[in-house]
From Swiss-Prot:
Pfam families assigned to the protein according to its UniProt record, in alphabetical order: EFG_C (PF00679), GTP_EFTU (PF00009), GTP_EFTU_D2 (PF03144), LepA_C (PF06421)
Entry keyword set: Cell inner membrane, Cell membrane, GTP-binding, Hydrolase, Membrane, Nucleotide-binding, Protein biosynthesis
Name of the protein described by the UniProt record: Elongation factor 4
InterPro entries per record: EF-4, EFG_III/V, EFG_V-like, EFTu-like_2, LepA_C_sf, LepA_CTD, LepA_IV, P-loop_NTPase
The EC number(s) this enzyme carries: 3.6.5.n1
SUPFAM superfamilies named in the record: EF-G C-terminal domain-like, P-loop containing nucleoside triphosphate hydrolases, Translation proteins
Gene3D superfamilies (UniProt xref): 3.30.70.240, Elongation factor 4, C-terminal domain, Elongation Factor G (Translational Gtpase), domain 3, P-loop containing nucleotide triphosphate hydrolases, Translation factors
Organism whose genome encodes this protein: Chlamydia abortus (strain DSM 27085 / S26/3)
Topology of this chain in the membrane: Peripheral membrane protein
Family as reported in the entry's similarity comment: Belongs to the TRAFAC class translation factor GTPase superfamily. Classic translation factor GTPase family. LepA subfamily.
Biological role stated in the UniProt entry: Required for accurate and efficient protein synthesis under certain stress conditions. May act as a fidelity factor of the translation reaction, by catalyzing a one-codon backward translocation of tRNAs on improperly translocated ribosomes. Back-translocation proceeds from a post-translocation (POST) complex to a pre-translocation (PRE) complex, thus giving elongation factor G a second chance to translocate the tRNAs correctly. Binds to ribosomes in a GTP-dependent manner.
GO molecular function: GTP binding; GTPase activity; ribosome binding; translation elongation factor activity
Length: 602
């Protein structure tokens, strides 16, 4: 790394909604500072996963150090790229804590969107210097002046220094680099000399183990230091090397000093040993107080993952273990189901997190899997005063011992064009939402604030919102509190046998509609047998919906040409008895498609 001058360091992040051009602007900054040679340049350089490139999203934070010459001085610009999605908001908050400034990228045609709003508020809470960037000014629909006013009126940011740019053509990129140097303050000179470094991410490397990404707040960290983690108060480790992102992770001589961003390796083997937001300090001269803001990341929803072919169980176990190496938020627990066999109960931070894990298992490990419907964590208060937390219908206790149940709620902000207001209000009403306030974002768009049960969000809220707003609506949510709710267990019985994979926890008002839709769906996907198959939805053993798969008919009188009717009656009677016996002892085989179809139900 080049000469160290604290006043020449700039640590910044990029805040943007999906598809507003964050990764493309990062590419242009890397090009303009010659961090990457032209022949090595490719689109979305910092997005290393194929999934990130295809979806146009950032899943893992990717830091990079750039050197920029300005007015005869060389500045070290540390970009700490962050995931934009609400599922990863804790990681975003830690990454922003490692910065002094942020670039707020807004599409000059689309304007401010919900996810960028959520992250701007996180940045404002940390008192970061925010530079608004109006991207995609080359588009015919771009209206930079209108978007400037939107940012000023709704977010309350001064847009005097806002920069209009086009990441596609490169226009305005040099102005962005100048603004980073001029407007974002350098790191403050630390008052302490003891090492304090904020962990904002970690990565598993098969050769060196865990690489811990840090921003050094005070002191320095170098090879040979013995370090410990303050919040988790675990063992101590010897630092085997320190490095920087140039743009690839590269080991360096010397140390990482106050204000700098880099990583260290220390013979750590599990990501779970390294907690995002924790403080690193040395054992010899340890800091007295850790950095503020650390909290454990806990999953907010769960789903079962099962291999379609039971012989793939060990391969699935291996796949999940490997994914967990780079994803400390993913929790895994072995479970078994009568219908689906052996599988895993996995915990996720949200729907996007869940989708990403599923897709990676299928793509990277070439496995066919079935996932049960996602479930949130319910609080069950029993009559004896005890409290249980359950995320699986199989753990639902006997209703006679339940005092009441509580479900998690979330605060939701929805940004939408005005003409879709009534459709969104109907959607939120259907999802048991409570309207808090409605504000004008500009002449044509509104911001709606709602409280909604998390269970209603995880099913299909995003799809329905996109559907009723023709793709123009966007939303973000943050976890709220637990509230009392009439939550019950809905069981599905096939041929009078309960099938655990189809049972779910639902609100009483939605139970009948949900039960009916599952029964109707199963009639279409379970093949006919030689006997009638009843499909029933039941609550507390009381049937609330029923469909019947008709028996395959066999003409047993086909060989009787004319003759006495009693002969035919005898054959029909014999067939009837046989079908009755088959119904008693016959097993209904449920195809895998049935499980997949039921998951598609709202």
């Amino acid at each position: 790394m080049k000469e160290y001058k604290l006043e020449n360091i700039r640590n910044f992040s990029i805040i943007a909604h999906i598809d507003h051009g964050k990764s493309t602007i990062a590419d242009r900054l890397l090009e303009s500072t010659s961090t990457v040679e032209q022949r090595e340049m490719r689109e979305q350089l910092l997005d290393s996963m194929d999934l990130e490139r295809e979806r146009g999203i950032t899943i893992k934070a990717h830091p990079v150090t750039m050197y920029y010459k300005y007015n005869g001085e060389v500045y070290q610009l540390n970009l700490i790229d962050t995931p934009g999605h609400v599922d990863f908001s804790y990681e975003v908050s830690r990454s922003l804590t490692a910065c002094e400034g942020a670039l707020l990228i807004v599409d000059a045609a689309q304007g401010v969107q919900a996810q960028s709003l959520a992250n701007v508020y996180l940045a404002l809470e940390r008192d970061l210097e925010i530079i608004p960037i109006l991207n995609k000014i080359d588009l015919p629909a771009a209206n930079p002046e209108k978007i400037r006013k939107q940012i000023e009126d709704y977010i309350g940011l001064d847009t005097t220094h806002a920069i209009a740019c086009s990441a596609k053509t490169g226009e305005g990129i040099s102005e962005i680099l100048e603004a980073i140097v001029e407007l974002i303050p350098p790191p403050k000179s630390p008052e302490e000399t003891e090492l304090k470094a904020l962990i904002f991410d970690s990565h598993y490397d098969p050769y060196v183990g865990i690489m811990v990404y840090v921003r050094v707040m005070s002191g320095e960290i170098k090879k040979g230091d013995r370090i410990t983690f303050m919040a988790t108060k675990g063992s101590s480790f010897e630092v085997l090397g320190v490095g920087a992102f140039l743009p690839e992770a590269t080991l360096i001589e010397g140390s990482l000093r106050a204000g700098q961003v880099g990583y260290f390796i220390a013979n750590l083997k599990k990501v779970k040993d390294v907690k995002i937001g924790d403080t690193v300090t040395t054992v010899k001269h340890s800091a007295k107080v850790p950095l503020e803001g650390f909290k454990e990341i806990n999953p907010v929803m769960f789903a079962g993952i099962y291999p379609i072919d039971s012989s793939d169980f060990d391969a699935l176990k291996d796949a999940l273990s490997r994914l967990q190496l780079n994803d400390s938020a993913l929790t895994i627990e072995q479970e078994s189901s009568h219908s689906l066999g052996f599988g895993f109960r996995c915990g996720f931070l949200g729907l996007l997190h869940l989708e990403i894990v599923f897709e990676r298992i299928i793509r990277e490990f070439d496995l066919d899997i079935i996932a049960t419907a996602p479930s949130v964590i319910y609080k069950v208060v029993l009559k004896n005063g005890k409290t249980l937390f359950i995320d699986n219908p199989t753990a639902y206790p006997d209703p006679s011992i339940i005092e009441h149940m509580e479900e998690p709620w979330v605060h939701v902000n929805i940004i939408t064009p005005q003409e879709y207001l009534s459709s969104i209000m109907n959607l939120c009403l259907d999802k048991r939402g409570v309207c808090l306030k409605t504000e004008m974002l500009d002449q044509h768009r509104l911001v709606l604030s709602y409280d909604l049960p998390l269970n209603e969000i995880v099913s299909d809220f995003n799809d329905k919102l996109k559907s009723v707003t023709k793709g123009y609506g966007s939303f973000d949510y943050r976890l709220g509190d637990y509230r009392k709710g009439s939550i019950i267990k809905l069981e599905i019985l096939i041929n009078d046998e309960p099938v655990d994979a189809f049972s779910c926890l639902v609100h009483r008002d939605k139970a009948e509609a949900r039960g009916r839709s599952i029964c109707e769906k199963l009639v279409g996907v379970i093949p006919q047998q030689l006997f009638k198959i009843p499909i029933q939805a039941a609550i507390n053993k009381k049937v609330i919906a029923r469909e019947t798969i008709r028996a395959l008919s066999k003409n047993v009188t086909a060989k009787c040409y004319g003759g006495d009717i009693t002969r035919k009656r005898k054959l029909w009677e014999k067939q009837k008895k046989g079908k009755k016996r088959m119904k008693e002892f016959g097993k209904v085989s449920i195809p895998n498609t049935a499980f997949i179809e039921v998951l598609k139900i709202d």
